[in-house]
A protein has these predicted regions:
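Mature N-terminal segment immediately following signal peptide/propeptide cleavage
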Residues: 20-27
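Disulfide-stabilized, aromatic/cysteine-rich ligand-recognition loop
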Residues: 18, 100-101, 105-107, 119, ...
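Short, well-ordered junction/capping motifs at the entry into regular secondary structure
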Residues: 151-179
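Active-site microenvironments of metalloenzymes and redox enzymes
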Residues: 42-146, 250-252
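Short, polar loop/linker segments at the starts of domains and inter-domain junctions
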Residues: 30-45, 221-232
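Hydrophobic h-region of N-terminal signal peptides that target proteins for export
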Residues: 9-17
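Sec-dependent signal peptide recognition
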Residues: 2-9
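Cytochrome P450 core scaffold surrounding the K-helix E-X-X-R motif
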Residues: 30-34, 189-197
């Protein structure tokens, strides 16, 4: 029985990784608004991978594109931590599994992979709209079970050994692992701070990192979104992080 369950989980993960899930048009409601900013941003229909890119999938990419191998990538495009958990340029080794989500990848590398697959990185609006969907409806904030589960995910430290991508519970669209597995790059990850230098904009810094302090108890479902925005605001495109991966999106 255990073997059967294991095989079923592996097949489920493989199917989820391979699938692009169609997402209908909708709206994204930004957390941080300027005086003249719209309260809602229209999001056109698109498709997004059901699960993050795995080590095995990224290995295929670097084998086909030598300039993105660990020893050959330019430091302009990835810092010293790039693919540090792999055993070599084209060898995963024993520290990671082919089915786990790839991490230690820069925004430049993630963008190149997505283009290689004929797609792109999802925009922040797209990613957040899909991530806001619950298990049974497109508005997860209205699902107590979903809100509780997401809060638990963000309060729990990441495991030392990541599980296989694509094994988390799917949301109403059929997308998995948006919460509780790894952080994910978006195509415009730094869009919240491009209007100024965050190092000198203390007001913006307070808004990004302390904004949750102004949210009442009824809005606790927003805390994970504040965490994501705070994390994104700290990134630069060449950065690599041990729990930062990505997934691919495509236009219709």
């Amino acid at each position: 029985m255990r073997v059967a369950h294991f095989i079923a989980a592996v097949l489920l993960a493989a199917t989820a990784r391979a699938d692009l899930v169609p997402i209908p048009a909708g709206v994204y409601r930004p957390l941080f608004l300027g005086e003249n900013d719209p309260k809602e941003i229209p999001v056109r229909a698109f498709s997004i991978a059901a699960a993050p890119v795995t080590n095995g999938e990224f290995l295929d990419f670097v084998r086909a594109n030598p300039k993105w191998r660990r020893s050959q990538v330019k430091r302009l495009f990835a810092d010293d931590g790039y693919l540090r958990h792999w055993a070599g340029d084209t060898e995963l080794g024993t520290r990671c599994d082919a089915r786990q989500p790839v991490t230690w990848v820069s925004w430049f590398a993630a963008k190149a992979y997505a283009a290689w697959k004929g797609g792109r990185l999802p925009t922040t609006a797209e990613w957040e709209m899909v991530a806001g969907a619950g298990f049974t409806t497109a508005d997860g904030a209205r699902e107590p079970e979903f809100v509780k589960e997401v809060a638990r995910w963000y309060a729990t430290p990441a495991p030392e050994t990541l599980p296989a991508a694509g094994t988390g519970r799917a949301n109403v669209f059929g997308v998995r692992d948006l919460h509780g597995l790894v952080w994910e790059w978006t195509g415009d990850f730094n869009s919240a701070i491009v209007t100024g230098d965050a190092r000198g904009d203390t007001g913006l810094e307070r808004q990004l990192f302390c904004g949750a302090g102004s949210v009442g108890a009824k809005d606790t479902a927003n805390f994970p979104a504040f965490m994501r925005f705070g994390f994104r605001s700290s990134l630069q495109a060449a950065y690599t992080v041990h729990n930062l991966g990505f997934r691919v999106a495509k236009d219709p």
